[in-house]
Amino acid sequence: MSLSPSSSPAPATSPPAMSLPPADSVPDTSSPPAPPLSPLPPPLSSPPPLPSPPPLSAPTASPPPLPVESPPSPPIESPPPPLLESPPPPPLESPSPPSPHVSAPSGSPPLPFLPAKPSPPPSSPPSETVPPGNTISPPPRSLPSESTPPVNTASPPPPSPPRRRSGPKPSFPPPINSSPPNPSPNTPSLPETSPPPKPPLSTTPFPSSSTPPPKKSPAAVTLPFFGPAGQLPDGTVAPPIGPVIEPKTSPAESISPGTPQPLVPKSLPVTTSYHRSSAGFLFGGVIVGALLLILLGLLFVFYRATRNRNNNSSSAHHQSKTPSKVQHHRGGNAGTNQAHVITMPPPIHAKYISSGGCDTKENNSVAKNISMPSGMFSYEELSKATGGFSEENLLGEGGFGYVHKGVLKNGTEVAVKQLKIGSYQGEREFQAEVDTISRVHHKHLVSLVGYCVNGDKRLLVYEFVPKDTLEFHLHENRGSVLEWEMRLRIAVGAAKGLAYLHEDCSPTIIHRDIKAANILLDSKFEAKVSDFGLAKFFSDTNSSFTHISTRVVGTFGYMAPEYASSGKVTDKSDVYSFGVVLLELITGRPSIFAKDSSTNQSLVDWARPLLTKAISGESFDFLVDSRLEKNYDTTQMANMAACAAACIRQSAWLRPRMSQVVRALEGEVALRKVEETGNSVTYSSSENPNDITPRYGTNKRRFDTGSSDGYTSEYGVNPSQSSSEHQQVNT
């Protein structure tokens, strides 16, 4: 049976006499070679030589137990306390008789230590002087499977090997006591009480009862035994474990085994780590919270920006969809006008007749909610709608091309204008102009439903207007006569539509071909101005036209003198043309009529002196259409005559604006004695249409003489220089 590493077999009656090692062993915790002891017990087989463990963990591990062959006397366990550093001497095999003295097993050669394993139980208090008679040997708390031979308790300690520092020593199995009379073989390792009164301070084993003092103890010890608290692996109760205290001066400083010292706090590193981890968690939580707040802020900003952008786009869309309501209010006729959105009108089976040039169409139910992307038609679709552009569907022919009536798949009647090849700009310019015109919606303007581009073919699709043109009802339909009230209504409606183009559209749209043939009538004889903006498409035409056909520079008899002479076009050019239309409504005569069998006369030249007399208070009978048979309101007739006279003034800057004409026709203002100079605008081909600059308010002679100041019209159109045309305009 092997003894525990903390006890060695020795007779219990060993005398206290022993030799002490030199005092110099205290500082370096290594015992000098001890002198031979007194007669030892029967020789035991000396343990085999084992490598010396490092000094740090040497005291913590009891010497390796060696098998005791025949102990003569009951051994007294005097193991060195664990966690004591004592450099064990190399194992020596020296047979000696049993000694009455008890030798500490710390002098026996210790087992080798493995740095990766934990050191033996550090539970023994410092082994200083302990009262004799109490021999306590704490066995190691771990139970390794390997067993080592017990230490020869009778052999004197040989000289200590050189010191080594080592890490924690792995636990070893407790020695098995071979002698049955062992008083306390499994008691916890505590300093034993032996007869010698003065134990040496050195850590080498001596016959004295005092165990070597501890020098160094590991900071933390891992106990492999996980049994009940206070119980050793073999079932015995271990005393409280306390820290190892080094003796500093004398063996008198002893610690009673009954007063255990607290363990070296193992939890200090854990506590520090816990505090560090808590601080880390707190810091991480703060960072995560800050990131969440920043993310929420960014989301809120993005939401607000998106919402504002949507609001702005919806507001712009609403304004683009309802320009006529606001702008008409500015024109003074909000009560009678309403905004129009391009839609596909329902089928209307009314007769459409075109005469005198550019034909247009009118539909009482305006096409609604048809934008340009949906207004893109294929040539095959329009050809099928018009019956292959057959003659039976031909509505008329003008300077721009042919106009055919068509019916779309949904039953909507439209007027398809097929433009002449070579009389248009490039495809890009054509589409840009069509896009501009398609956004113009007004009660008194014919809506553009769509267009078609097929190779060199260009087609425009308009809403169909059932009641023909003003020209037809004034000059061609001799079977019926337009009453005065109807004539006044047509004049007011056409003036409102033209005022919208001039003052409410951006950029300003100049019609350039205002005439009775381009004023269409719906089923209620409400006027609708058509073909506005087409002059932009055909500014580069070189086609020759007769003086009776509609052409891009306007129709003879309607063109303003400055426009015919200089090619300049302004909003006042349209005002002049509208004055000619008013004269047609008053007199019932066309813009150019035959003076005699060989001479034609301009309506303006014929009516101008008569207007002066009528406005001055004389009778209107010689001016008014005789077919009316004096069935008219004199005041209304006087207002219309005053408007016509103001519109056909020779100087453009003296002509009123169309909004003023509307108010005068409605009787809100009088233009009889008011010299309306107005402010006109002109555009150069290199200018932005939005940059409106007054041109004509400073020098009225500029248009009277036809002189040019270097500016050309927005469209770059030059009037025809044929003498016949000039003669027709100026006659």
Swiss-Prot record:
ATP binds at L395, G396, E397, G398, G399, F400, G401, Y402, V403, K417. Residues 1-280 are extracellular. One of its GO terms (molecular function) is ATP binding. The modification Phosphotyrosine is found at Y462, Y563. Its EC number is 2.7.11.1. Residues 1-29 have a biased composition (Low complexity). The modification Phosphoserine is found at S549. The chain crosses the membrane at residues 281-301. Residues 302-731 are cytoplasmic. Residues 1-264, 310-341, 678-731 are annotated as: Disordered. Mostly expressed in flower buds, and, to a lower extent, in inflorescence bolts, roots, seedlings, leaves and siliques. It is a single-pass membrane protein. Keywords: ATP-binding, Cell membrane, Kinase, Membrane, Nucleotide-binding, Phosphoprotein, Serine/threonine-protein kinase, Transferase, Transmembrane, Transmembrane helix. InterPro entries: Kinase-like_dom_sf (IPR011009), PERK1-13-like (IPR047117), Prot_kinase_dom (IPR000719), Protein_kinase_ATP_BS (IPR017441), Ser-Thr/Tyr_kinase_cat_dom (IPR001245), Ser/Thr_kinase_AS (IPR008271). The active site is at D513 (proton acceptor). One of its GO terms (cellular component) is plasma membrane. It catalyses: L-seryl-[protein] + ATP = O-phospho-L-seryl-[protein] + ADP + H(+); L-threonyl-[protein] + ATP = O-phospho-L-threonyl-[protein] + ADP + H(+). The modification Phosphothreonine is found at T550, T555. Pfam families: PK_Tyr_Ser-Thr. Residues 389-671 form the Protein kinase domain. PANTHER family: PROLINE-RICH RECEPTOR-LIKE PROTEIN KINASE PERK14 (PTHR47982:SF22), PROLINE-RICH RECEPTOR-LIKE PROTEIN KINASE PERK4 (PTHR47982). This is Proline-rich receptor-like protein kinase PERK14.
